[in-house]
Amino acid sequence: MEHYRKAGSVELPAPSPMPQLPPDTLEMRVRDGSKIRNLLGLALGRLEGGSARHVVFSGSGRAAGKAVSCAEIVKRRVPGLHQLTKLRFLQTEDSWVPASPDTGLDPLTVRRHVPAVWVLLSRDPLDPNECGYQPPGAPPGLGSMPSSSCGPRSRRRARDTRS
């Protein structure tokens, strides 16, 4: 790839993993260059001011961690929020062009699967049986687990323990 330079990157559209959201939900699309201070200022202002009852932080790739951090900070500052977290992979299409046009190389298009996260914080109760639900006040990682399976499990095959 040393003979190519990146021309652009486009995130391919994908359906939201939370289609049942009320229309007045505040959606915070976190990007890699987003300032946490700015994101929190808007989200906390709306939640504490009472103009929003739900907020969704979404981020993909390197911004996924920043989206989770924003949600955790909001949960600390606004007590009693219910949380629903969804994880998916999104497709990203990268365009690469030859570094010098006289090399005879063709432009390339590469599709990558990048991790993405959506974190819904709500003042209203959410379905506790939905996969990814965490009740208010629960420590991270200790959300209620529904009795049924939450989706596909790892596709890894069991290790062969024979010597």
Swiss-Prot record:
GO terms for molecular function: RNA binding. Residues 1-22, 129-163 are annotated as: Disordered. One of its GO terms (biological process) is tRNA 5'-leader removal. InterPro entries: Alba-like_dom_sf, Alba-like_NAB, DNA/RNA-bd_Alba-like. Residues 143-152 have a biased composition (Low complexity). Residues 153-163 have a biased composition (Basic residues). GO terms for cellular component: nucleus; ribonuclease MRP complex. Its main location: nucleus. It is found in: Nucleus. Keywords: Nucleus. Gene3D superfamilies: Alba-like domain (3.30.110.20). PANTHER family: RIBONUCLEASE P PROTEIN SUBUNIT P25-LIKE PROTEIN, RIBONUCLEASE P SUBUNIT P25. May be a component of ribonuclease P or MRP. Belongs to the histone-like Alba family. This is Ribonuclease P protein subunit p25-like protein. It comes from Homo sapiens. The lineage of its organism: Eukaryota, Metazoa, Chordata, Craniata, Vertebrata. The gene is RPP25L.
